[in-house]
Regions:
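Acidic, low-complexity intrinsically disordered segments
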Residues: 2-6, 46-82
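Short, charged/polar N-terminal "headpieces" of proteins
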Residues: 1-23
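A short, structured beta-strand/loop element
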Residues: 16-44
Length: 82
């Protein structure tokens, strides 16, 4: 893992957006990463998106790291996994 990119264990389920959101620190600056519950369940199966996220955390954090290195933030500074 790149030491300049750190993922604290503070993921949440955002009911309004139907999304798992998880913070990331990039050189000390906080960004938000997100993946929809629908995408999580389609990719990994299961029935509870937050549990599925936790079970697949390492792969999802690696994917988010790649997007961050490629500067794939949206206009709001969020990094969306698909």
């Amino acid at each position: 893992m790149n030491q300049a990119i750190h993922f604290p264990d503070r993921e949440i389920w955002d009911e309004n957006q139907q999304t798992v959101c998880f913070p990331v620190l990039v050189h000390g600056m906080q960004l938000t990463c997100a993946i929809t519950g629908e995408t999580l369940l389609r990719r990994f199966g299961g029935s509870d998106p937050l549990s599925v996220f936790c079970e697949n955390r390492w792969d999802l954090e690696e994917e988010a790291s790649d997007l961050i290195r490629d500067q794939q933030e949206d206009d709001q500074g969020w990094v969306w996994l698909s």
